[in-house]
Amino acid sequence: MTVRLIVKYPDPRLRAAAEPVTTFDEGLRKLADDLLDTMRAAPGIGITAPHIGISKRVVVLELDRAAGPKIYINPEIVWACEEKIRHQEGSVSMPGVVDEVERHARIRLRYQDLDGNEQTEESDGLLAVCHQHEIDQLDGIFWVQRLSRLRRERLIKRYEKLQR
C-alpha cells in the first residue's frame, strides 16, 4: 500500500474520460489499495484513479471509516430519480475549497467488484452525491463544471490564492 501523488487542478488529465477496466488481477487490487491510502492521507471521502493520473474507471469511497471502504470498478448510473438535492462538494485535486452542487437525490448504480462480478446498488443522500461526483470525474467532468460560471470563477480564484 502506497500514498500516491494526487493530480492537482487544472491538470488536463482531470478533464479526460477514463478507460474501462478489463483486467481484474492483483494490479487492480494494488491500485485500489493505493487509492484508499491516498484518499485517507489527503484526507477525503472519495477518490478515482484519474486523481492519481491513471486513466482507469476505479472509484474508492469511504464515508465512514468504521464501515470501511467501498470499491467500484466501471461504475455507471442506470437510474436517477427526478428529485434533486444540494450538497457541499470538493475534491482531493482542489483542496481547501468547497461549494454547493445540485445532484439527483437517489440513484441506482451498476458496477463491477474487484473480481469482475457485476453488482447493483441504490444510494441516496451523501452516498448518492459521492457516486455522481466520482462518476462525473471518470467521465472527465471536474466538479467545478457543475457550478454556474460566476460561482466557478470565484471558487477558482479562491483556490489559486490558497496555492500561493
From Swiss-Prot:
<dbReference type="GO" id="GO:0042586">
    <property type="term" value="F:peptide deformylase activity"/>
</dbReference>
<dbReference type="Pfam" id="PF01327">
    <property type="entry name" value="Pep_deformylase"/>
</dbReference>
<dbReference type="GO" id="GO:0043686">
    <property type="term" value="P:co-translational protein modification"/>
</dbReference>
<dbReference type="GO" id="GO:0006412">
    <property type="term" value="P:translation"/>
</dbReference>
<dbReference type="InterPro" id="IPR023635">
    <property type="entry name" value="Peptide_deformylase"/>
</dbReference>
<comment type="similarity">
    <text>Belongs to the polypeptide deformylase family.</text>
</comment>
<protein>
    <recommendedName>
        <fullName>Peptide deformylase-like</fullName>
    </recommendedName>
</protein>
<dbReference type="InterPro" id="IPR036821">
    <property type="entry name" value="Peptide_deformylase_sf"/>
</dbReference>
<feature type="active site">
    <location>
        <position position="134"/>
    </location>
</feature>
